[in-house]
Every structure is written in structure tokens, then in C-alpha cells.
Amino acid sequence: MTMKLEEIYQSFIAQGQAHDPRTMAEITRQLAQEKERYEKLSAEEKQYYDLERLTNPYADTRILAGKSTHKVKTILCGIDVETQDLLLADRLIEKGEKIDLVLAHHPEGQALLGLSDVMNLQEDVLMKQGVPIGLAQGMLSCRISEVKRAFLPYNVQRTINTAQLLKLPFMCVHTPADNQVQWYLENLFAEQAPVTVQDVLDLLRHIPEYQEAMRIGAGPILINGEPSRRTGKIMVD
């Protein structure tokens, strides 16, 4: 199956919204507020505005390099994709491998600078767990500001420039992918109703992806408490 780069991008956004902790009404309201902010900008300010924000609620998910019409059949995926990984992709292509798109989970470039913007989603997650929204916003405001400042001195375009010079289509998908995992685990726990912490660990260890991680010593572990303790309410974050 072959898809255009833009089709893949829009598909990821749609799947992210379908499995978002927020309702579609809440997401639509966010996009409407963004449109209002845009319309209030001066003509000069609009020159520098990221128009993707009007239709994509995930600032950490972007097409970073490549034409939207580029046809994709084979994708090289990675959690963290940086310059060395793009050079590897280019080398594999030289050796005859077919790679139409390099896809990263963690954001790069403009999407990395947008990471702090999607952290407001955590406020909604906490609110759904019973935390008053005012308290949730207060708890997260310092952390969001800290993350935003942390990336300001970064050379965020280095990896993007590499992809452009190598003529490699490059995309990152962060929050939409996280939403899928959160949705899956929340439904798993709701269906299986684990009673103890050990039950939770056992459920996770039956998931193929976690089993693969366990083989390299990176599987689920308990970092606080005892396996015999009751779970009570489970929050997936």
C-alpha cells in the first residue's frame, strides 16, 4: 500500500484525536481558540505564525522535511531520530534498502519547540482523575515553563537540515502516539480490573512490546511500593 506523506500525517492526527483523553468538543474548542488568536495578529505577526496550529492540535507532531505529495510505501521508524540515524538511513538506501520516509517518535525541530504547548493536555488528564482544574494548572505551570525554556538554546534545526540535505522525508509523531498507548492501557485495566500492583505488572508483561523490552532489560518495573498492595484507582500517564 502506498500513501502520500500528507495522508500519513493527517491519519496520525486523526488517530490521535480519536484516542485523545479529551473529548472532540474540547479539541474543537482548542482549535477555535487558536483561530481566534491568529485572527487577532497583525499582518506582520501572521508572517511567522505556524498555520498547522489551526488544524493540528499537537504542536509536537509535524512533517519536518519532504514534500506533502511524496509517495510512501516503506518507513524506517525510531524513538529518537537524530543526524546519525538519518546518515544510517542514507547508507541503507545506498546499499539497496527501500526507505521512503524516516519517522521519529520524539519531536525534532519546530516540533521540539512545540513540546511545551501540548503539555496542557496533562491538565485535562489530571482533571479527569478528580484533581480540580485550577490546582492541576498550578501544578503544571512551572514544569511547562521549565520545559519551554530548556529547549530555547537548542540547535533544533540540525537534524532537519540533515534530512533536507540528504533529501530524506522526515516526520515526527509524539502526542498522537502517546494517546494510543494511554487509550490501550486504560481499556486493558478497565477490562481486566487488576486487584494488586503485581496484577498490573503481570498484565503489562503479557504485552508483546513489553516482552521485547524485557529481553533487553528494559521491561516494566516497580519503582515504589510493594507488589502485594491494592491498586485502587489506576492512572495511565
Give the predicted meaning of each segment.
Residues 1-237:
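Hydrophobic structural segments
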